[in-house]
Swiss-Prot record:
<dbReference type="InterPro" id="IPR027417">
    <property type="entry name" value="P-loop_NTPase"/>
</dbReference>
<keyword id="KW-0997">Cell inner membrane</keyword>
<feature type="domain" description="ABC transporter">
    <location>
        <begin position="6"/>
        <end position="247"/>
    </location>
</feature>
<keyword id="KW-0813">Transport</keyword>
<keyword id="KW-0547">Nucleotide-binding</keyword>
<dbReference type="GO" id="GO:0005886">
    <property type="term" value="C:plasma membrane"/>
</dbReference>
<dbReference type="InterPro" id="IPR017871">
    <property type="entry name" value="ABC_transporter-like_CS"/>
</dbReference>
<comment type="subunit">
    <text>The complex is composed of two ATP-binding proteins (MetN), two transmembrane proteins (MetI) and a solute-binding protein (MetQ).</text>
</comment>
<keyword id="KW-0067">ATP-binding</keyword>
<dbReference type="Pfam" id="PF09383">
    <property type="entry name" value="NIL"/>
</dbReference>
<dbReference type="InterPro" id="IPR041701">
    <property type="entry name" value="MetN_ABC"/>
</dbReference>
<dbReference type="Pfam" id="PF00005">
    <property type="entry name" value="ABC_tran"/>
</dbReference>
<dbReference type="InterPro" id="IPR050086">
    <property type="entry name" value="MetN_ABC_transporter-like"/>
</dbReference>
<keyword id="KW-0029">Amino-acid transport</keyword>
<dbReference type="GO" id="GO:0016887">
    <property type="term" value="F:ATP hydrolysis activity"/>
</dbReference>
<comment type="function">
    <text>Part of the ABC transporter complex MetNIQ involved in methionine import. Responsible for energy coupling to the transport system.</text>
</comment>
<dbReference type="InterPro" id="IPR045865">
    <property type="entry name" value="ACT-like_dom_sf"/>
</dbReference>
Length: 341
């Protein structure tokens, strides 16, 4: 039986409009099971419900119906002591750092331990451990105004780890950072996951974040989970239109003038590759073996952690029987051949 650390069951959240009796659903019947030790991404467009879902997971927002179980125990039980014990198992990393400007780095990290009545001796020991862990040993007595964005987020991560949480909740942890700093923060999160078996949930709209470190991903659209699975499977073979749109696999990145000027007798096709397939001369093989014309409109190669993946949008024309043979050839190579128009 799989060890699920977090189980979200039929979770819904609606907000009642003050000016009327009508309500709007922010979340609708969310079902998710997140394994222990997983780096789990939740992605979606703005307004999809990501932030509301995170607020429910950390207990700041009560659902209209449904439940969230942390290690088998309900997050919404009425016993204050039991609820406090569950919430102490979670640490929170914020988009805009949320550091106290009047406190030093060490004092910011100490804050969760102070409100948890942890002894001063233990606090000092833990602060030193965490500073070493996030690579800020030399910044202990520095104030946040003297830190870079990446350093501030490292302080935020250290603070979130202060009370030895089992779960790290990250709300857009890299969206305020430049690409190089983003990679270093994601690498730190991956190292924490590997070293401590920490379960990490990342709310993000940045596909690169999910590509770089997430094991599994859920796609949220209009308050509903429309797709969920291993990152490679979801990104290479998306099933839902919302996912395809997020990943730019519906042809929306092809210049409008090319779409308007294209010959309607030609097929607009997406070719999807992974691993060694991306290294093969597929286009030249199609042209030579099947006597068809293939015109590349857009696309390129990318990486999903250590796996090469590629997507090409091409126009294909030729005799129908030759195109059918080419499609069969692509299928035999396990290359995605999806007709867009």
């Amino acid at each position: 039986m799989k060890n699920y650390l977090i189980e979200i069951k039929k979770l819904s959240k609606n907000f009642l409009h003050s000016s009327s009796q009508h309500s709007t659903y922010a979340l609708k019947d969310i079902d998710l099971a997140i394994p222990a030790g997983c780096i789990y991404g939740i992605i979606g467009m703005s307004g999809a419900g990501k932030s509301t879902l995170l607020r429910c997971i950390n207990g700041l927002e009560a659902p209209s119906k449904g439940d969230i179980l942390i290690e088998g125990k309900s997050l919404f039980q009425k016993n204050p002591a039991a609820l406090r014990a569950i919430r102490q198992k979670m640490g929170m990393v914020f988009q805009h750092f949320q550091l106290f400007s009047s406190r030093t780095v060490a004092e910011n990290i100490a804050y969760p331990m102070e409100i948890g009545f942890i002894s001063q001796v233990f606090q000092e020991e833990r602060i030193n451990q965490l500073l070493n862990l996030v690579g800020l040993e030399q910044k202990k007595e520095i104030y946040p105004t003297s830190l870079s964005g990446g350093e501030k987020q490292r302080v935020g991560i250290a603070r979130a780890l202060a009370n030895h949480p089992h779960i790290l909740l990250c709300d857009e942890p890299t969206s305020a950072l430049d690409p190089k700093t983003t990679r270093s923060i994601l690498q730190l999160l991956a190292e924490l996951n590997q070293k401590f078996g920490l379960t990490i949930i990342i709310i993000t709209h940045q596909l690169e974040t999910v590509k770089q470190i997430c094991h599994r991903v859920a796609v949220l659209s209009e308050g509903e989970i429309v797709e969920e699975g291993e990152v490679k499977q979801v990104f290479i073979r998306p099933q839902h239109q919302a996912t395809r749109h997020l990943l730019h696999l519906d042809g929306d990145q092809i210049p409008v003038d090319l779409i308007q000027q294209r010959n309607p007798d030609k097929l607009l096709v997406r070719l999807g590759f992974e691993g060694n397939q991306a290294k093969e001369p597929i286009i030249s093989q199609l042209i030579k073996q099947f006597d068809i014309e293939v015109n590349i409109l857009s696309g390129g190669l990318d990486y999903l952690q250590k796996t090469i993946v590629g997507n090409l949008f091409v126009e294909i024309s030729g005799l129908p029987q030759n195109i059918q043979k080419a499609q069969a050839f692509l299928k035999s190579k396990q290359i995605i051949c999806e007709i867009i128009l």
